[in-house]
Amino acid sequence: MGILFDGIQKLPSSDVGISRDLLLQWMAQCQMLEKVNMRLNDAAIQVSEWFRKKGFRTCILKGQGNALLYSTGLHRTPGDIDIWVEGGDKRVISFVRSISPHEKACYHQIEFPSYKGVEVEVHYRPSFLLCFWHNRRLQKYYERVKEEQFSHRVKLGEQGVITIPTVEFNLIFQLTHIYAHLMNEGIGLRQLLDYYFVLLHADIKDVVELQRNLKHIGLWKFAGAIMYIMHEVFGIPASRLIVPPNEKYGKFVLNEVLEAGNFGKHDKRNRLGKSQLGHNLQRVYRDMRLVKYFPAEALCEPIYRTWHFFWRLKNKK
């Protein structure tokens, strides 16, 4: 909403076409967004500093780092704080549970006590893929480039300094994040808008290497789908695209975005109930819908879900 309001402000008053009362309402909501983002900025700085004093290097993923790419970052709709903590799953899980013993862990992250009302998720892996061999390659990529990410410090407005990933890293990482939303519940507009700004700010020195990585990790077709959406819907110039747009895949993914929304909140196809059985059946139904376009991820999803059940049992407090 905040970004839409920024666009409306650039229009001549005669072209706005909405009432003054609604404009004032949006203005008030934008002011509220600014306050929330300022609070999240402060939380990101303080949580990062807290981990640093405990001996961990960190990197803020998505969120407040992405907001720096926007022309008016304080108007970006914020979420929680995702912080990548160096050290591997066993060390990080052990440390977090020494602070808060009952936090739940999954393959890539563990819950963490909220900081001044702000939700915090601690990542020991930035993201993952459901396909085991593609995920293995993705984790090797993260390990290979992590040094640059943990040392990429930027100023967060006037509030302080944080460490965030490079734009080059985000071209792959945030693509996997959007992919995970597609495979699990649904892609939201915020994820796509974030990626739009990542593309706008990307200064790709070696596009051949980037494309090689996308193919190696199994993201090539999905990247083509997102490039189609970026070009056709968001209007990004063709010169900014990282792979050739794929119209067939792009239209399919765009339809999923429009049908489901973020986390599938608006998906009328979800009719199997909210019970554990209904949720699992819904996942199978989703896999069947996706398998034609993204077979490796869709076919591995039930296997991954079973494997992850035992992983969580093993890593349960």
PLM segments and residue spans:
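Conserved NTP-donor binding/palm subdomain of two-metal-ion nucleotidyltransferases/polymerases, i.e.
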Residues: 1-79, 84-317
